[in-house]
């Protein structure tokens, strides 16, 4: 059940480290090399280098000795290169010993310390659960979310098997509807590169504005998206946080799937600390999803004057869905709709003329004089003309 809910993230892969005879031999040979290098370089090399070699020797020993205090795993980066990794099985205890037992006042601040409505998950994670004097405070946001943001859930969407053609087609169709409703200006945050590629192939020839993909956080693509007057950006991985698209650049944020974390050796070890799988999901997995969702939501409004629609397409997030309450708890109070027409009206009520003139089928910016001379009957341009007539 855990894997079915959460096998989404593909930014980096973590696999359990299995000690084979060949790996044991290789590790011991590497350890001997590091030890010999410390002896050979002890007179000539700087002390920090000798210390570094000693640390690497000790780290390798964890793997061939199979130290039970550590979770040992292989982490593959975006290019598929593996790294040997070890993390403590009890990080909260280490933090208590290294930090909180020193009785030095500490102030922890972040925009995503809360998971849903509670600080409890982060308090447990950083080892503050047994500390008596822990005070929490949540500052109100200066953003007027109820006025400047609209949350959309699709209505009547059938539950489709994960990664099936039916699900991919549903997502593609909904994205096209929303891009049309918001006249472009869209960021789509995927939880898996495989899903992003599949949807991209379905919609790439149907987009009314330029469509771009960010593979492994390509800064060139992000810069190109910012230069465009109007475009749609498909992104995943690290783009859920740390990228900034202020103003009308992103006026529609689409999240096809809830960002549940993928199972890995660290989470499997955490799972053994809970009596039941359900307790583990509610105490660890759901809070992680809520934090990641809030980080993704943060791409929508970057200044106090920004306006944006946010669409979550996952059927589990919709009213009546399995995680609807958890999703709403993770986000600020927002008006909610299940009608794409409301999304269109929200955008038309809040955007100026320049926003709409950058939307036409050939993806060129169109001013009033050019539009009058074009005589086009393109559906997208007819919608633009109707907008101005209503104004």
What residue spans do the PLM features occupy?
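Alpha-helical interaction segments
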Residues: 183, 377-378
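ASCE RecA-like P-loop NTPase motor cores
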Residues: 1-361, 365-371, 385-390
